[in-house]
């Protein structure tokens, strides 16, 4: 299998080398060899003496290797340090699965250094297994079976490894509402059956430190009692965080670490603690006191990402042994937690041994190669060449599945620095395994120029030669240290080479020598850079037909401005000097309402090309010319006596021409119709007035007044008649109602209230005869 990988590794290496050689050199403000090396991985420096000519900057020494060779720099004079990787031989003794153990990298900015890491899975590697169990009431039958597992569990480990140890811990949930019932009686016995003996709820209890004594495991687990809580999710993530954060209390060795997490329900995570008024985020530290997580009610649950980071940091591989209904939930959790597995637990945990074996085989047959946190200036990628023939390139971490015992697999690691970095180190590890690779990183930014670096005569005995460039002594500057500063600082000298305080020295196109700009010679053919501050050139002008200033026949470029030859004009000399296309029939340029540019009228606002004759949006000054129309045509109105003086520039046209129609009143109240015909220029009009006017007779005042008075009187009489009729009808209706009431008031008997004025008395003694 190694033979199959070698050609692929060679191909990747060749492609990387070809890519590096084909890179361009984007140099900027380069004056030294170090500046050049930092400019990019494609840049190289020529240390040949007198390689740069008169007026050329030192930056011409910095270019791609191909360009430098083409310019006459021999290969021995080209300084081009490359990124390197040096591996240290593996230490003898011990069972090592990862090699090499130490690598030293010399990194040039932008250029990757590559090295190979080999992983060989060992047989019988030591294992520590910690069994973390949910003791909520629904796990009662599971606890009964786990109490019998001690010897079987350790025997199962010994089938896999020569050195196995087991430990035990349990969890329920935080002991505050709404997670558990906080009634004192329920806190003492949280089980639904009061006759059942249960232990008080707790967050996490470390029961048994990792041991190889199966009898001790069975004894300690046998003492455990079931507990209970209120809500369905459990506090399992709290317990896992403590198992990972307390290595000494748990007893972890530097071997393969397995954490079996057994539960039949989901889990609380960060933010759920707010339901119980717990706001402080989980700090990821160990808080075990007397083997109990007593600070559970002070810290929120950990987030899944926080737990994943802690497990990876502690090199712990979790195995989630969950019931059928929770398998999909925990499979999603394994997508976030690397090197984790899920197994379906039977309702009574009777298959836990088989589950652990299968999960371990699955975990140990897959290898992830990863590194610890790095600064932004370093980038690490992995190419994985697996034993099953599957390959992956440029991945953020190495990944191979189906790894077999004693069959090596190769990872190619590529490390790239974005700038010259400080010396530092980082660690590469295979997740779930204890072996690591320590990578020491050093910068590769210095130029090792082994030529006449001590020759001072080439620099006028006032400096030394370094990589083909003079490095002047204090008080001297210049390409050959020929300029003495005479006590002036470099800032003062450079100030006279700046156009203003905000500009760069010599516009970035020259060198400041003794306070004066010496402009560079351009690499562009026929381009000349000049000016006091090298701010001018003969190429930076507008172009016409792809040529600067339209070509030498049309114009020449002087300091960003085109100077046109005779017969041409325009910002790029693109126009012929002619106005023929701008003249109207009268020979007036743009009708006096625009300017002729490039033989085309540029009309004033509102007027339309081609000759600026029409202005659809302009307002017609009809009222302003009404008095002139009256005096010129009818010899009346306010201007009648001095019409020639007031309207001297306005002509009366004998016949109607195209123009704007106007209707205005004259001094006699008649309506005039006339046409305004615009002449060349602005506000210049001639008139054509219609012969007839429309005069309207004045109103008959007497008829209007008489009609108005008569109308008012008639309206008044009509209103009185209506009022009288309505009044009569109302009286008639009231009279009829009175008559009707009168008929209703006739009596059939005497009025009981009436008393007659005559009284008749009968004499009883009187005898009738």
Swiss-Prot record:
Residues 24-74 form the PSI domain. GO terms for molecular function: amyloid-beta binding; integrin binding; metal ion binding; protein kinase binding. Residues 724-769 are cytoplasmic. The modification Phosphothreonine is found at residues 758, 760. It comes from the Eukaryota. Residues 23-700 are extracellular. A motif (Cell attachment site) lies at residues 397-399. The keyword Calcium applies. Residues 449-482, 483-535, 536-574, 575-613 form the I-EGF domain. One of its GO terms (cellular component) is cell surface. The VWFA domain (or beta I domain) contains three cation-binding sites: the ligand-associated metal ion-binding site (LIMBS or SyMBS), the metal ion-dependent adhesion site (MIDAS), and the adjacent MIDAS site (ADMIDAS). This domain is also part of the ligand-binding site. This is Integrin beta-2. It comes from Sus scrofa.
């Amino acid at each position: 299998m190694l033979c199959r990988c070698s050609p692929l590794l060679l191909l990747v290496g060749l492609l990387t080398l070809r890519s590096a050689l084909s890179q361009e050199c984007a140099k900027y403000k380069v004056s030294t060899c170090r500046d050049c090396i930092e400019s990019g991985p494609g840049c190289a420096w020529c240390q040949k003496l007198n390689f740069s000519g008169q007026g050329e900057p030192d930056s011409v020494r910095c270019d791609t290797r191909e360009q430098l060779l083409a310019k006459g720099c021999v290969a021995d004079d080209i300084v081009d340090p490359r990124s390197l990787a040096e591996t240290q031989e593996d230490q003898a003794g011990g069972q090592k699965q990862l090699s090499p153990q130490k690598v030293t990298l010399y990194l040039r900015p932008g250029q990757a250094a590559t090295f190979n890491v080999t992983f060989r899975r060992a047989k019988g590697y030591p294992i520590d297994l910690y069994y973390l169990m949910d003791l909520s009431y629904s796990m009662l039958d599971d606890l009964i079976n786990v109490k019998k597992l001690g010897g079987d569990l350790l025997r199962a480990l010994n089938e896999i490894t020569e050195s196995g140890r087991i430990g035990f811990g349990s969890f329920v949930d935080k002991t505050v509402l709404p997670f558990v019932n906080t009634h004192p009686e329920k806190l003492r016995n949280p089980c639904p059956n009061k006759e059942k003996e249960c232990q008080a709820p707790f967050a996490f209890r470390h029961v048994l430190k990792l041991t190889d004594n199966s009898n001790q495991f069975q004894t300690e687990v046998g003492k455990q009692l079931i507990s209970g809580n209120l809500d369905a999710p459990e506090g399992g993530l709290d317990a896992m965080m403590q198992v990972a954060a307390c290595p000494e209390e748990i007893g972890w060795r530097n071997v393969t670490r397995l954490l079996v997490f057994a539960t039949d329900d989901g889990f609380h995570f960060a933010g759920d603690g707010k339901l119980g008024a717990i706001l402080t985020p989980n700090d990821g530290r160990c808080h075990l006191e007397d083997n109990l997580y007593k600070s559970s009610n002070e810290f929120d649950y950990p987030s899944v990402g926080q737990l994943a980071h802690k497990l990876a940091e502690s090199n712990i591989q979790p195995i989630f042994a969950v019931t059928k209904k929770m398998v999909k939930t925990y499979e999603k959790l394994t997508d976030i937690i690397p090197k984790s597995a899920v197994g379906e637990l039977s309702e009574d945990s009777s298959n836990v041994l088989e589950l652990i074996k299968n999960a371990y085989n699955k975990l140990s047959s897959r290898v992830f190669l990863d590194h610890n946190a790095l600064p932004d200036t370093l980038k690490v990628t992995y190419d994985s060449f697996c034993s099953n023939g599957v390959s992956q390139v440029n991945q953020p971490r190495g990944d191979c599945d189906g790894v077999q015992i004693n069959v090596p697999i190769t990872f190619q690691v590529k490390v790239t620095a974005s700038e010259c970095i400080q010396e530092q180190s980082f660690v590469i590890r295979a997740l779930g395994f204890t072996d690591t690779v320590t990578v020491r990183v050093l910068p590769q930014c210095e130029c090792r120029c082994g030529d006449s670096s001590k020759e001072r005569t080439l620099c006028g005995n006032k400096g030394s030669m370094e990589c083909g460039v003079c490095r002047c002594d204090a008080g001297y500057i210049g390409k050959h240290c020929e300029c003495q500063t005479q006590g002036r600082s470099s800032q003062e000298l450079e100030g006279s080479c700046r156009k203003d305080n905000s500009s760069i020295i010599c516009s970035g196109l020259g060198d400041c020598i003794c306070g004066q700009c010496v402009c560079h010679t351009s690499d562009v053919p026929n381009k000349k850079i000049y000016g006091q501050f090298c701010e001018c050139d003969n190429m930076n002008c507008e172009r016409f037909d792809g040529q600067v200033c339209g070509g030498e026949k049309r114009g020449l470029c002087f300091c960003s401005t085109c100077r046109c030859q005779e017969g041409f004009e325009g910002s790029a000399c693109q126009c012929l000097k002619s106005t023929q296309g701008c003249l109207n029939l009268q020979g007036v340029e743009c009708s006096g309402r625009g300017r002729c540019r490039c033989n085309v009228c540029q009309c004033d606002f509102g007027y339309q090309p081609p000759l600026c004759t029409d202005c659809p949006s302009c307002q017609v000054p009809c009222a302003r010319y009404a008095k002139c129309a009256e005096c010129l045509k009818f010899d009346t109105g306010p201007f009648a006596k001095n019409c020639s003086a007031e309207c001297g520039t306005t002509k009366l046209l004998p016949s109607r021409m195209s123009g704007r129609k106007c209707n205005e009143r004259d001094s006699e109240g008649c309506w005039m119709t006339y046409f305004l015909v615009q002449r060349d220029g602005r506000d210049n009009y001639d008139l054509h007035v219609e012969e007839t006017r429309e005069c309207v007779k004045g109103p008959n005042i007497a008829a209007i007044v008489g009609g108005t008075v008569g109308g008012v009187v008639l309206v008044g009489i009509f209103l009185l008649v209506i009022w009288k009729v309505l009044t009569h009808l109302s009286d008639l209706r009231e009279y009829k109602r009175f008559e009707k009431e009168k008929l209703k008031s006739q009596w059939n008997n005497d009025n009981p209230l009436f008393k007659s004025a005559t009284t008749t008395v009968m004499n009883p003694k009187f005898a009738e005869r």
